[in-house]
Regions:
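Phosphate/pyrophosphate-binding loop motifs in nucleotide- or prenyl diphosphate-using proteins
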Residues: 1-202
């Protein structure tokens, strides 16, 4: 049945699109928050920081991602900005380069002991939330494969950047050491079950 609004869209069709549009709005909002979080990290970095060009490029990529999310995938002759494979590949290469400059992880490390690193650590958390929102949208409508991949790689990179910024500022990394209760629970899970008692032969 057609609606009386003159838009030519059925009430049933509009209702079917509502969950998709809610998911799109949540994903778009999360990416906007991520861009703002990276802006805070940039503001905390000194002007001569080697991370500024990288983070500035990432902010520009997030504008592309916002455009990508704002418009559904349809057969348009002039498609809007979309996240492309080359942008994901750049993140991967940059992450590998940054990893070579920090001490290899041998335990769970808590970065963020300088102001800029703390901002990057917060941006990492926002990025993971944006990744979940984008994945939720992808379950409801066909989407390009590069949206979630970009955010997944960006989350990895922001964590490594936070560690590298701590190293540059001389902040000592802190290792997360499990509590005694956590170790006891882990030991219970891996302890072998006792063998059943043997019955005497009849």
């Amino acid at each position: 049945m057609r609606s009386q609004s003159g838009s030519g869209v059925s009430d049933r069709g509009a209702a079917a699109r509502a969950p998709v549009e809610r998911a799109r709005a949540e994903a778009f909002r999360a990416v906007g928050e991520l861009e703002a979080a990276i802006g805070l990290a940039l503001a905390a970095l000194p002007d001569e920081s080697r991370f500024r060009p990288w983070l500035t490029r990432i902010r520009a990529d997030l504008v592309d991602l916002g455009s990508d999310l704002a418009l559904p995938f349809e057969g348009e002759r002039r498609p809007p900005l979309r996240i492309e494979a080359r942008q994901v590949q750049w993140l991967e290469a940059t992450c590998e380069q940054a990893r070579r400059e920090v001490v290899p992880l041998r335990a769970f490390m808590l970065p963020g002991w300088s102001e800029a690193a703390a901002c990057l650590r917060a941006a990492h958390g926002v990025c993971r939330r944006a990744e979940r929102r984008v994945a939720g949208l992808a379950r409801l409508e066909p989407a390009g494969s590069h949206r979630a991949a970009y955010l997944r790689r960006l989350g990895d990179l922001l964590f490594v950047f936070a560690r590298a910024v701590d190293a540059d500022t001389g902040a000592r990394p802190r290792l997360r050491r499990p509590s005694a209760a956590t170790l006891a629970r882990a030991a219970e899970r891996i302890a072998p079950e006792p063998a059943p008692p043997r019955q005497a032969p009849a």
